[in-house]
Design a protein with these regions (language model features):
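Secreted/periplasmic serine-hydrolase-like ester/acetyl group-modifying domain
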Residues: 5-10, 14-106, 190-209
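C-terminal regions of proteins
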Residues: 126-203, 208
Protein backbone atom coordinates (compact mmCIF):
# COMPACT_ATOMS: atom_id res chain seq x y z
CA UNK A 1 0.00 0.00 0.00
CA UNK A 2 0.99 3.63 -0.47
CA UNK A 3 -0.66 4.73 2.78
CA UNK A 4 -1.33 2.82 6.01
CA UNK A 5 -3.99 4.41 8.24
CA UNK A 6 -4.00 3.64 11.96
CA UNK A 7 -6.89 4.61 14.24
CA UNK A 8 -5.39 6.01 17.41
CA UNK A 9 -7.53 4.91 20.34
CA UNK A 10 -5.68 1.58 20.41
CA UNK A 11 -2.57 3.48 21.51
CA UNK A 12 -4.12 3.99 24.94
CA UNK A 13 -5.02 0.36 25.56
CA UNK A 14 -2.69 -2.14 27.14
CA UNK A 15 -1.09 -4.41 24.57
CA UNK A 16 -0.34 -7.08 27.17
CA UNK A 17 -4.00 -7.43 28.08
CA UNK A 18 -4.74 -8.72 24.57
CA UNK A 19 -3.55 -12.31 24.84
CA UNK A 20 -0.37 -11.21 26.64
CA UNK A 21 1.58 -11.26 23.39
CA UNK A 22 4.39 -8.75 23.06
CA UNK A 23 3.90 -8.70 19.30
CA UNK A 24 0.10 -8.43 19.43
CA UNK A 25 -0.17 -5.10 17.61
CA UNK A 26 2.05 -6.07 14.71
CA UNK A 27 0.54 -9.54 14.49
CA UNK A 28 -2.91 -8.07 14.03
CA UNK A 29 -1.63 -5.54 11.52
CA UNK A 30 0.01 -8.31 9.51
CA UNK A 31 -3.37 -9.99 9.10
CA UNK A 32 -4.62 -6.99 7.13
CA UNK A 33 -1.61 -5.41 5.44
CA UNK A 34 0.29 -7.57 2.96
CA UNK A 35 3.73 -6.01 3.51
CA UNK A 36 3.70 -7.02 7.18
CA UNK A 37 3.00 -10.72 6.65
CA UNK A 38 6.54 -12.03 6.25
CA UNK A 39 8.30 -10.40 9.16
CA UNK A 40 9.90 -13.27 11.08
CA UNK A 41 9.32 -11.85 14.55
CA UNK A 42 5.55 -11.86 14.16
CA UNK A 43 4.97 -15.36 12.80
CA UNK A 44 4.21 -17.33 15.94
CA UNK A 45 3.34 -14.74 18.58
CA UNK A 46 -0.42 -14.70 18.08
CA UNK A 47 -2.18 -18.02 18.49
CA UNK A 48 -5.67 -17.56 17.08
CA UNK A 49 -6.74 -15.02 14.48
CA UNK A 50 -9.89 -16.72 13.25
CA UNK A 51 -11.91 -13.53 13.63
CA UNK A 52 -9.52 -11.62 11.39
CA UNK A 53 -8.37 -14.13 8.79
CA UNK A 54 -11.63 -14.68 6.94
CA UNK A 55 -11.78 -14.90 3.17
CA UNK A 56 -10.61 -11.88 1.24
CA UNK A 57 -14.03 -11.52 -0.38
CA UNK A 58 -15.73 -10.80 2.95
CA UNK A 59 -18.21 -8.07 2.16
CA UNK A 60 -17.90 -5.87 5.21
CA UNK A 61 -14.12 -5.32 5.01
CA UNK A 62 -13.89 -5.34 8.78
CA UNK A 63 -16.89 -3.14 9.57
CA UNK A 64 -20.13 -4.51 11.02
CA UNK A 65 -23.09 -2.63 9.60
CA UNK A 66 -25.35 -1.17 12.27
CA UNK A 67 -28.10 1.33 11.44
CA UNK A 68 -29.57 1.43 14.93
CA UNK A 69 -29.61 4.81 16.65
CA UNK A 70 -28.90 5.63 20.29
CA UNK A 71 -28.13 9.37 20.55
CA UNK A 72 -25.22 10.92 22.40
CA UNK A 73 -26.60 13.71 24.55
CA UNK A 74 -23.53 14.81 26.49
CA UNK A 75 -22.81 17.96 24.51
CA UNK A 76 -19.34 19.25 23.58
CA UNK A 77 -16.56 16.91 24.65
CA UNK A 78 -13.36 18.27 23.06
CA UNK A 79 -12.37 21.00 25.50
CA UNK A 80 -8.98 22.56 24.71
CA UNK A 81 -6.40 21.95 27.42
CA UNK A 82 -2.69 21.31 27.95
CA UNK A 83 -3.33 17.97 29.62
CA UNK A 84 -1.70 14.83 28.22
CA UNK A 85 -2.74 11.22 28.63
CA UNK A 86 0.18 8.85 28.24
CA UNK A 87 0.07 6.22 25.54
CA UNK A 88 0.54 2.62 26.56
CA UNK A 89 4.31 2.10 26.59
CA UNK A 90 4.25 -1.06 24.46
CA UNK A 91 1.77 0.44 22.00
CA UNK A 92 3.99 3.49 21.56
CA UNK A 93 7.00 1.26 20.95
CA UNK A 94 5.20 -0.69 18.25
CA UNK A 95 3.83 2.50 16.74
CA UNK A 96 7.39 3.59 16.02
CA UNK A 97 8.21 0.15 14.60
CA UNK A 98 5.19 0.39 12.31
CA UNK A 99 6.28 3.82 11.10
CA UNK A 100 9.79 2.60 10.35
CA UNK A 101 8.55 -0.54 8.63
CA UNK A 102 6.07 1.39 6.50
CA UNK A 103 8.81 3.78 5.41
CA UNK A 104 11.19 0.94 4.59
CA UNK A 105 8.55 -0.44 2.20
CA UNK A 106 7.60 2.84 0.57
CA UNK A 107 4.38 3.41 2.52
CA UNK A 108 3.38 6.38 4.66
CA UNK A 109 1.85 5.94 8.10
CA UNK A 110 -1.12 8.21 8.80
CA UNK A 111 -2.81 8.54 12.19
CA UNK A 112 -6.55 9.18 12.40
CA UNK A 113 -8.75 9.63 15.47
CA UNK A 114 -12.34 8.58 14.80
CA UNK A 115 -15.21 10.63 16.25
CA UNK A 116 -16.14 9.20 19.65
CA UNK A 117 -17.32 11.24 22.65
CA UNK A 118 -17.11 8.15 24.84
CA UNK A 119 -13.51 7.29 23.97
CA UNK A 120 -11.71 10.44 22.92
CA UNK A 121 -10.43 13.45 24.88
CA UNK A 122 -8.26 16.47 24.29
CA UNK A 123 -5.64 14.88 26.54
CA UNK A 124 -5.38 11.94 24.14
CA UNK A 125 -5.34 14.33 21.18
CA UNK A 126 -2.41 16.25 22.65
CA UNK A 127 -0.34 13.13 23.20
CA UNK A 128 -0.91 11.80 19.69
CA UNK A 129 -0.28 15.24 18.19
CA UNK A 130 3.01 15.50 20.12
CA UNK A 131 4.15 12.10 18.87
CA UNK A 132 3.10 12.83 15.29
CA UNK A 133 4.99 16.12 15.21
CA UNK A 134 8.10 14.59 16.79
CA UNK A 135 8.10 11.75 14.26
CA UNK A 136 6.99 13.67 11.14
CA UNK A 137 3.77 11.67 10.78
CA UNK A 138 0.51 13.13 9.49
CA UNK A 139 -2.27 13.21 12.08
CA UNK A 140 -5.95 13.97 11.54
CA UNK A 141 -8.26 14.22 14.56
CA UNK A 142 -11.80 13.90 13.26
CA UNK A 143 -13.17 14.83 16.68
CA UNK A 144 -12.09 18.40 15.90
CA UNK A 145 -13.39 18.46 12.34
CA UNK A 146 -16.81 20.06 11.91
CA UNK A 147 -16.67 19.43 8.14
CA UNK A 148 -17.73 15.82 8.79
CA UNK A 149 -21.20 16.95 9.72
CA UNK A 150 -21.60 14.30 12.42
CA UNK A 151 -25.00 14.56 14.11
CA UNK A 152 -24.76 12.89 17.49
CA UNK A 153 -28.53 12.63 17.66
CA UNK A 154 -28.59 10.19 14.73
CA UNK A 155 -25.07 9.08 13.72
CA UNK A 156 -24.16 6.86 16.69
CA UNK A 157 -25.49 3.42 17.54
CA UNK A 158 -24.59 3.37 21.24
CA UNK A 159 -24.60 6.81 22.78
CA UNK A 160 -21.36 8.11 21.34
CA UNK A 161 -19.12 5.07 21.64
CA UNK A 162 -19.31 3.98 17.98
CA UNK A 163 -20.72 5.47 14.80
CA UNK A 164 -23.61 3.74 13.09
CA UNK A 165 -23.84 3.19 9.33
CA UNK A 166 -24.85 6.79 8.58
CA UNK A 167 -22.03 8.20 10.67
CA UNK A 168 -19.50 5.78 9.20
CA UNK A 169 -20.46 6.82 5.66
CA UNK A 170 -19.68 10.44 6.52
CA UNK A 171 -16.27 9.53 7.92
CA UNK A 172 -15.45 7.21 5.01
CA UNK A 173 -16.35 9.87 2.44
CA UNK A 174 -14.27 12.53 4.16
CA UNK A 175 -11.22 10.35 4.79
CA UNK A 176 -11.34 8.93 1.26
CA UNK A 177 -11.38 12.39 -0.31
CA UNK A 178 -8.71 13.67 2.05
CA UNK A 179 -6.33 10.78 1.36
CA UNK A 180 -6.89 11.07 -2.39
CA UNK A 181 -6.06 14.76 -2.39
CA UNK A 182 -3.20 14.63 0.11
CA UNK A 183 -1.42 11.59 -1.34
CA UNK A 184 -2.55 11.55 -4.94
CA UNK A 185 -4.24 8.17 -4.59
CA UNK A 186 -5.95 7.08 -7.77
CA UNK A 187 -9.69 6.47 -7.97
CA UNK A 188 -10.03 2.78 -8.83
CA UNK A 189 -13.82 2.64 -9.06
CA UNK A 190 -13.69 2.39 -12.86
CA UNK A 191 -10.77 -0.03 -12.85
CA UNK A 192 -12.04 -3.50 -13.86
CA UNK A 193 -9.49 -5.10 -11.54
CA UNK A 194 -11.42 -3.60 -8.61
CA UNK A 195 -14.92 -4.29 -9.88
CA UNK A 196 -15.60 -6.69 -7.02
CA UNK A 197 -15.26 -3.82 -4.54
CA UNK A 198 -18.19 -2.01 -6.14
CA UNK A 199 -20.22 -5.22 -6.27
CA UNK A 200 -19.48 -5.92 -2.62
CA UNK A 201 -20.37 -2.34 -1.72
CA UNK A 202 -23.81 -2.62 -3.30
CA UNK A 203 -24.50 -5.94 -1.60
CA UNK A 204 -23.22 -4.63 1.73
CA UNK A 205 -25.32 -1.45 1.59
CA UNK A 206 -28.47 -3.46 0.94
CA UNK A 207 -27.83 -6.01 3.68
CA UNK A 208 -30.00 -6.12 6.75
CA UNK A 209 -28.47 -5.22 10.09
Amino acid sequence: PEVVVLETNCLFRSVKSKGDSKDYVLDRLSDHVEIFKNHSRWKDAFVSTNSLTKKKDEKNRGFIKRSTVKPYEGGAYMHASEERKSMDADAEKYLLLMKEYCESHGAKLVLVSSPSPKNWTYAKHNSVSDWAQANAVTYEDLNLNDALGIDWASDTKDGGDHLNFDGAKKVSAYVGNWLSEAYGLKDKRNNPDYKHWEEDSVEYASARN
